[in-house]
Swiss-Prot record:
Originating species: Aeropyrum pernix (strain ATCC 700893 / DSM 11879 / JCM 9820 / NBRC 100138 / K1)
Coiled-coil features, chain-numbered ranges: none
Pfam family, one: Ribosomal_S13_N
Matching InterPro entries: Ribosomal_uS15, Ribosomal_uS15_arc_euk, Ribosomal_uS15_N, uS15_NS1_RNA-bd_sf
NCBIfam families (UniProt xref): PRK08561.1
Biological-process GO terms, alphabetical: translation
Family: Belongs to the universal ribosomal protein uS15 family.
Protein name: Small ribosomal subunit protein uS15
Highest taxon of source: Archaea
Keyword Nucleus (UniProt): no
Length: 150
């Protein structure tokens, strides 16, 4: 009964070959500097990948550097404290709670919040198992407001 996940996700077509393209004008060092510069401007790993693809013509970072954008950020100490997908879900939940404060009779939004928070809890459980989050980390809606606002 996965009624919330029936639609496809839009995405760009990935390059067919895993080796770096021959027309690429950037060296691996320059790409790492670009990634660090974009991270310092406040962009997340997925947004950095999109900017590198659209503005700099770098289709994929991994075949060129041998590591992904998140790994580069982790090496340089610029990675976000929470995984990006979890942070976006928490941000969505905070916005939905704000909506429900203004519209308490919106039952469809209430159901959406229940589903969203259960998705957050499942993702937290996964990240605890993988060692990405500390074992005592818990999702708290009140603390999430502070987390998202910073």
């Amino acid at each position: 009964m996965n009624k919330r996940r029936e639609k496809g996700q839009s995405h760009s077509t990935r390059p067919p070959h895993p080796q770096p393209p021959q027309w690429l004008v950037f060296t691996p060092e320059e790409i790492e500097l670009l990634i660090a510069e974009l991270a310092k401007k406040g962009y997340g790993p997925s947004m950095i990948g999109i900017i590198l693809r659209d503005q700099y013509g770098i289709p994929l970072v991994k075949p060129i550097l041998g590591k992904g954008v998140s790994e580069v950020l982790r090496e340089k100490g610029l990675h976000p404290p929470l995984p990006e997908d979890l942070l976006m879900l928490i941000r969505k939940a905070v916005n939905l709670r704000r909506h429900l404060d203004e519209h308490p009779k919106d039952y469809h939004a209430k159901k959406g919040l229940i589903d969203l928070e259960s998705k957050i809890r499942r993702l937290v459980k996964y990240y605890k198992r993988r060692g990405v989050l500390p074992p005592d980390w818990k999702y708290d809606p009140e603390a999430a407001k502070l987390l998202v606002s910073t």
